[in-house]
Amino acid sequence: VMEDCGGFAIAGNTLVWRSDADAPQRDGIKLVRCSAGTLTGLQSEHLCYGTPERGAGVTLEQCHDITIGHCQILDPQVRGIELLDCVRCQLSANSIIDRRDPPSMLQAIRLLGDCRDNLLHNNMLGGAVDQAIVLADGAATVRGNLDLDHPAD
């Protein structure tokens, strides 16, 4: 968890849940009230943070001017990325895919609350049980994403 941080860059990290089956499933990345930062080049598998109601492998709450780009978020437990009350955030060129059979990821990307002026583009998404992207009208501009479960004709 990072809270009230600004002007940061997190790059080139690997996060993999390797705990035993009885250990609490709580790993993930959570940014709260952060601004002017980047998360790039993350390689992750089986991030377990979140519940069906709230949270994701990568969760941003009340953040602005954050870029998440060129990350692989594979087999997240509930969802890949969630933004809550975020402004001017960019999710670009990420692979958010549940490869399990059967999958458990509800959504790849979800925006909730007072999100506005965000950009979701050129992401590769697949394996969502519900929908690949869930957001309210006006929460983000969405373009150029590839939904592997529903490819364009």
Regions of interest found by a model, annotated:
Residues 105-153:
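Leucine-rich solenoid repeat scaffolds
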Residues 1, 21-31, 51-59, 75-82, ...:
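Extracellular beta-strand/beta-solenoid scaffold signature
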Residues 1, 13, 30, 92-94, ...:
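Short, Lys/Arg-rich amphipathic segments at extreme N-termini
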Residues 2, 10, 29, 39, ...:
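Periodically patterned hydrophobic/aromatic "hotspot" residues that form packing/interaction faces
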Residues 5-8, 17-19, 34-37, 45-48, ...:
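Surface-exposed loop/turn segments connecting beta-strands in extracellular beta-rich domains
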